[in-house]
Amino acid sequence: MGKLTYLRPHRGDIKPVLLLLTSHRLDCFLICTRCLERYTDLDRLKHIYVVANALGSEHQALAKRFVARHHNATLVERGPRGLVPAVLAAQNEILAAHMDDVIIKLDEDLFVTPHWLEHLIDGYCDHAERPDVPLVMPLVPISPPGRHVLNRFLRISYPSERAMYGGPPIEENWVYHRWMWEKLLHENLAEVYLHDLQPKYGYVGYLTINCVIFDQRIMRLVLPFPTNRVAGQTTSDEKAFNLALSSCKMKVAVLGRSIAHHYSFSKCEDYLRSHVSIDEVWRYMQGASAHPAATRQCRVPSGPSELTLLRAGG
């Protein structure tokens, strides 16, 4: 009898389930879905769930139109407003039904760029057989993991502006929010960063969950998400993921050659909107560029188990 050989499926055979959460940022949701449609072959996705949390009438109409345009999309409407219990309960139901699938979770204020899906699947493939790296995310400049991966680039490119990208945690650092968006919009920071051959991955022990790909390796550790307060404190899917990462000593792979853009954390949103208009962000996103992803093969685990160069110093 001839030797049996396991054939790894091509990465094109992987059809992730997309879980898109939206609640109150109507203009961000509009840009998010426009970028998805502009930069993604949505037929590559097994299914798209738009989890709509207590939307206003105009927002609801936009969500319904987006779903109607795509045969593989479903609108899941839940209330009242808030992660607990509505959104986490909806995620529990969806993820439990797709335990054997590859999942991409996306927030309404995250804007994808060309080849984002190919890069994300490629990163997933590189780590699919590593139990210690169950999550992969793009480089998101306005996020703690993204800021960590950008650290060396920022120090070399902007040595005289360290006060702009240092300081408080990113989630409440309005100076960094504004500074980063101005560099992206006016000095081609993303293009310059990608122009140099960056390390393919950076690794961190935590994540922000606005854009991430994962499978049952982490789902079996975090599901079901709590739908009540824990010890009197509010909870979230992000807290559940980070607790599992910490307790199991696991890492998140951050793509070094694929950037996606997060508009803002909630504490900085009002300030940022007064200085960086969402219309300007949309104009920028229409011209977004990225490196193409390489073609490769991947096995999905089964069962439990030169543009304008930055001036030195800005």
Located regions from the model:
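Short beta-strand-to-loop acidic/aromatic patch adjacent to the donor-nucleotide binding site
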Residues: 99-111
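N-proximal low-complexity "stem/linker" segments adjacent to membrane-targeting elements
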Residues: 1-35
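Active-site nucleotide-sugar/metal-binding loop of Leloir-type enzymes
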Residues: 88-102
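Conserved catalytic core of nucleotide-sugar-dependent glycosyltransferases
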Residues: 119-216, 220-222
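Short, acidic, metal-binding catalytic loop of nucleotide-sugar glycosyltransferases
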Residues: 34-45
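C-terminal catalytic/acceptor-binding lobe
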Residues: 31, 186-314
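A short, glycine-/small-residue-rich helix N-cap motif at loop->alpha-helix starts
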Residues: 78-88
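A conserved acidic beta->alpha catalytic loop
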Residues: 50-63
